[in-house]
Amino acid sequence: MRVKILPLVFMTLLLIVPSQMLLPSGQANASTPGFIERVYTDKARYEPGELVTVTAQINNSGGTNWSGDVTMTIFHLENAVYSSVQHASIASGQTTDVTFSWTSDTTDFKGYFVSVDAGSLGQGYSSIDVSSDFAKYPRYGYISEFSSNETAAESAAKVNELAQDYKINAWQFYDWMWRHETMIKRTGGTIDPTWIDLFNRQISWPTINNQIAAIHNQNGAAMAYAMIYAARENYSGFGVNPEWGMYMDPAHTKQLDVDFGNNSTYMYLFDPANAGWQQFIHEQYLDAIQTANFDGIHIDQMGQRNNIYDYSGNSIDLATRFTPFIKAAKTKLTAANSNQDFMTFNIVDGTVNGWAANDVSKNANVDFLYSEIWHLSNSYMQLKDYIDSLRANSGNKAVVLAAYMNYGENIGDRYEAEDAALQHTAVNTDHAGYTGSGFVDQFADVNDSVTFTITAPEEGYYSLVFRFANHSGYTATRNLYVDSNFEIELPFQNQPNWDTWSHETWHQVYLTPGTHTIKLSYDSSNTGAINLDSLTLGTFDEHSIRLADAMMAASGATHIELGEDSQMLAHEYYPNRSKSMRSTLKSAMKDHYNFITAYENLLFDADVIDNDAGKQFINIAGVNTSPDGAANTVWHMSKRTPEYNILHLINLVNNDQNWRNSGNQPTAQTNLATKVYIGAEETITGVYAASPDHNQGATQSLPFTTGTDSSGSYISFTVPSLEYWSMIYMKRSTAAPVDNMYEAETAIKSNVSVNTNHAGYTGSGFVDQFATVNDGVSFIVHASSKDDYVLRFRYSNGGSDANRDVFLNGKYAGTVQLKHTGGWNQWAYGELTVPLAQGSHSVVLWYNSSNSGAVNLDHLKLDKTYIWQFDRQIASVPAGYRITFKAGLPGWVHFGTDNWKNVMDIPLASNGSSDSSLNYEASIGPFPSATTVDVTFLWDDNNNGILEDMIDRWEGTDFQIAIP
C-alpha cells in the first residue's frame, strides 16, 4: 500500500441501475438460432469428493422451438473424465437453465475444464477447482464498498458474479474497519450498525456480514484487511501505548506518521517487534475473525522506512521485524481456530532481493505470498524473475501480485474542453502541457459552465476523468450534471502552478448506450478558479492487461485485480474507480480466469519448474522470438512437470517490454512452425494446445513429428494461431540412462560439433569445438528422488585451464572448473553440487563471456550426494552416495577409509558461489556399506595450487563419517 492523500469526493460512484447485472460469458454464433449465454458452477471451490452443480444458461433466439440433447464433458487437461447428457426443450425467444451434477474426484488440488455442447445452439465453457485449501490456488479479488443501502440479495449477487464468472475464490475486504487499531466500533459493548472510516465513508456492519456469508456460500475465503503497525489519531484513548511506537529520532520526540492533510486525521506507526503492540493488535485480528467470521487476515504495510528508532532510542531495522510479528500472529490465530488462521502479508515494492522480500518469503509462515509492485520491476522479465525468487524462497507457495495496470495514465476516449459548449468562459493557450488545441480559461465565476457531449458505446460503468489546472491557492469545486441531472460537487485540488495539470478528479456513472451530456458548472455554492483541459472516459487498456495477466500466470502467479460490480483495480486505494472496463475486456477476463482455473496444475503446482530459457530449446520458423520478454517478439517460456513439457508463447509483437503501461493489439501470428528440442531420454506421446484467446480455453490436440538434427532430438508441430497467449503442453515419459550417464553427443548442442578422434570417450563420441563464447551443451536429466546431486562433467583438456557456467532450470547454479588433464586423450571430471527435486531438470553447461579455455565434453553423470560443511557436519552417509565437502578456502580434502587406509587427496575447486564460506567444493565416493571414511583438510594458504604437505596448513582435526 502506498498512502495517497485523496479527498473522499474524488472517489464517487453513481448507481443508476442495479449493480448486480451479469454479462454473458458465452460466445454467440451468428449462424445458429441461439447461443449458450453462460456456464457456471455453484461454488468457487470444491472439497475433494464434493457434489458439483454446473448450470448452462441457453438462449433460443430462433423463430421456432428447439429440442435436443445438451452434453456436458469434464476434462482434466487432455483427458475426458466425465460426461453427461440432458435433454432440453427451449421455446422460441426463451432462455432456459440446463443443470448437471458431478461428484468430484477424491484427489485433492486438481483443476478441470467444463465443456457444454448444445448442438446448433452452440457451446459454452467453465472450470472447476477441486481443492481443500484456497491458498493453494488463490484467485484473489476484493470488496471495498460496504454501503448500508446494499441488501443481502445485492451482497450475494456481487459475490456470485465474481465467483461464477471470474472464478474468484478469496476476497480481500479493503478498508472495512473503523480504526486501524480498533477495527469494530462498539458502543457500550454493542457493535454499532455503521461507522465512518478513515476517508469519511460510511461502513455498514450488516453489509459486511452479508458479504462474508455470501462468500462462504461460494466456499470462498474472506480476508480482513489490516495494517501491521498502524493506529489512528488519539490512539491512547483506545489502549495503545506510545512506548510501542516507532520514532524519527532517538529521543522519541516525533513519531512516524502519515498526515492526511486535514489537520485531524493521522496514522501513527508502531514497532512490529514490540511485544506490547503485538499482544494488542493480535487481539484485534482475533476479534475481527471471531466476531465477523473472517477466514484470516490480510496484513498490509507501507514500504521501506529507514533511520527509525524505538521509544528507547534503539535503531530499528524494520525489514527484519515483520517475520516475528507474522509468526506470533499466526500462532495466536491457529490456537484459537486452525480453520480461520489464514494469513498473507504485503511485500511492498517487490523486486528480486528487494526490501524485506527475502526475509518474509523465506521465513514468514504466511499461507500465500502477496506483493505490491511499483517501479522496481517494470519489465516483464524483471517481474518474472521476482515471481521465480518468491516461489524459490518459499518452497513454491502461491504468489499473488497487486500490480495496478495503466497506473497514472489518463487513457480512454478524450473530449477536449475547448470543443465543448462553453458558457461565460474562454479558450486559451498560455499555459503549456494542454492537449488538443487549447484549454478552457476564465472558468471562475457563478454561471460559468462547460458541457461535453459524449457517446457511450455500450451500457455500463463509465469513469468521467477531468484534466485541470488550479493554482488559486485552495481547492476549487464544481457541480457535475449528467444529462441535466445534478450528480455531485467535485473538488479540483490546488496545484504547484498553472502549468501543472492533474487528472485526479473523477466520478463514475452508469450509462446507457448513446449520447449523453456531461456538464461542469460553477454554481452559487462553488468556489475557486480552474483551467479545464479535457474530459476522458477513463478506460483500462485491454491489450496490456491481457498480456500482463498472461505473463503472470505463465510465470506461476495470480493477479489481484477484480472487485465488486465488475470493477478492476486502478489504484492502490481500492475504491478509486478512475478507470472502467469495457465488455470486451470483461469477456477476456472471464476467459482468462476460467483458463487459469482449469489448467491450474500446469501453471501453479509446486512441481512446475522452469526449463532453461535459452533459444537452443525453441525454434519458430520466421518469427522473431525471445527468451526474456524483449519488445516486439514472441516470448517463449518453457516449463516442465513430472509428466509434461510446457511451452508458453506470449505475443509481444507490436508491444514493448514493460507490463504496466497501455499497449497495442499484438500482431496476430498464424501457423507457427515450431521445433522444440528435448532430451535424448525423453519420449513425447502427445502435443496439446490451449489458450484463453481461443475456444474459451478448450484443449486442441496437435499433430507432431519427431526427429534428430545436428543440434539434438526434437519434436515439431504447428501452432495454428497466437493472439495474446497460447500454452502448448506435451505429454512426456523419461527413461533414465544406465548409471545416470547422459552422453554429451546426444544432448542439445549449441555451436559445437561431435567427434571421435580422441580415445577413451564413452558412448558414440564426444562434443568437440567447445571453445568460444555462446558454445554450450544442454542436458535434460531425471532425478529419481529429491536429493542433493553432484553434476559430474567428464571432459578432456589438452590446453590451458578452463571453466564453464552451469545453469539449472534456467538459473545460474555455479561455475565448474575444467582444468588441464594432461592431454586430449586424458579424461577427468569437473563437478558442481546442486539440489534437485524429483523429476526432470534442464542442466546447461555454457561458455559465457567470463569463461575461458577449450574442452572436449564426454558426458554428464548424475550422482546423489550428502553435503558436509563446517557448520553442518554429518556423521553418516548411506551406501552408494557421494560426499561433497564445501568450504570457504582453497585446499585439498585428505581422506582414507577404515583408519586411514587408501589415502587420497582431492582438490577443493572454486564453484562460483556468492557465499564466501561455501565457494569451494570437492566430492568423494561412493563408498560401500560398513566403511568408515576418515577426513581432514590441507589448506592452500599461499594459493599456489600446489599440494605442499610440509608447507600448507593442516586442519588439525580428523573427522569420521560412517557408511552403515
Swiss-Prot record:
The keyword Repeat applies. This is Cycloisomaltooligosaccharide glucanotransferase. Keywords: Glycosyltransferase, Repeat, Signal, Transferase. Pfam families: CARDB, CBM_35, CBM_6, Glyco_hydro_66. Produces cycloisomaltooligosaccharide from dextran. InterPro entries: CARDB, CBM6, Galactose-bd-like_sf, Glyco_hydro_66, Glyco_hydro_b, Glycosyl_Hydrolase_31, Ig-like_fold. The gene is cit. Residues 1-30 form the signal peptide.
